Amino acid sequence: MRVSYVCIDPGVPVFGAKGASVHVQEVVRALRRAGHEVVVHATRRGDLVPADLADLEVVEAPVRATDPARREREQAGISRRIAHDILAGGTDLVYERYSLFSTALAAVTRSCPARGVLEVNAPLIDEQREHRVLVNERAALHALCAQAGCARLTVCVSDPVRRWVERLAPGARALTVPNGVSLERIVPFPEDPSGVVVAFVGTLKPWHGVEDLMRAAALARAPWSVRVIGEGPQMPALRALADGLGLDVDFRGAVPPEEVPAHLAGAAVGVAPYPDLGGADEQYFSPLKVLEYLAAGLPVVASAVGQLPRTLQGVGVLVPPGDPARLAEAIDALAADPDERARLGALGRRRAEERHGWERVVATVLDRVRQDEGVEP
């Protein structure tokens, strides 16, 4: 099957280091491993190209406008040009990562027999309005309704995201399918024998709660150290906080996705200290980092928010969000108990293998399309 993968979000380079880029690459890998021919159409290619995707055809159409209103119009125009290119080249399936103002999937599926899958990872209209600049909200809503209305399936990474889609686009055929993890790229490894290392992987933004991890480390009663794998706008503040607390934190900075396993090597615990963002529907994420910890055979300590209690049931340790003292207690307990770390790590790896491999995630999506249409995708 010929698959046209579309990502018109200029904040998501195909070959980038952030979690969204990892998501794009892993879905493409899973499609290719299933025997499908994939062509990617995107507004940003990126330059961190992994060896196994070096032959991937990526058609880039950059967004150049900086003025918010012009930028929105340009994104809409690019989506129309991409749809034209896809129709000219032919396709069997359009798999589009939901982006503001794009109507590419709708345009293609209205004009040819190709099926469409819309993947929604976040309530982008709300995010753009609250955290950035949204000039033409009506156009953004119209585009979402067109896309979800034409998609054979709208895949949502969490129940709150699915509810958001169903509220704004009532005709959407929506299904919750959480994120996955590469079971080949990320595998278990031995702990560093010189000490317990607690690892965080992710972009350094306020809603990831890394400052609570720093404060927990300052409260620790057992010996353990912190390793932060990632970059972001909070890096200067986190470095200053670590210095002020007298912590020797191992900041690794941004790393390409294929190098994350090497930076996790030697860690003994993985942590996801999310704060309380104000209600269940605000905790709409499906965190890749937690699945990577599970695949790496790390015991996980995470805030009891969003999907994490379900994901970590029986295989992880949950703590109240925004509580460095409770976070420190949980990490202290694991730091002092290597047998419990080994037990939880083995259970976590098994959970990742049974439920969360990317091949399983993509197969779930394609199977649902086939069931709805009675056609083998």
Can you name each region flagged by the protein language model?
Residues 333, 340-354:
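A short, well-ordered alpha-helix in the C-terminal region of glycosyltransferases
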Residues 152, 264-283, 298:
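Acidic donor-binding loop of glycosyltransferase active sites
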Residues 160, 180:
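Carbohydrate-associated surface elements
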Residues 201, 314-325, 333-339:
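Conserved acidic donor-binding segment of nucleotide-sugar-dependent glycosyltransferases
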Residues 84, 107, 124, 135-154:
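Membrane-proximal helix-turn-helix segments that form the acceptor-binding/catalytic region
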Residues 1-48, 52-54, 153, 215-218:
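N-terminal subdomain of nucleotide-sugar transferases
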Residues 4-6, 155, 190-221, 227:
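Conserved donor-binding/catalytic core segment of Leloir-type glycosyltransferases
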Residues 236-264, 269:
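Nucleotide-activated donor-binding/catalytic signature segment of Leloir-type glycosyltransferases, i.e.
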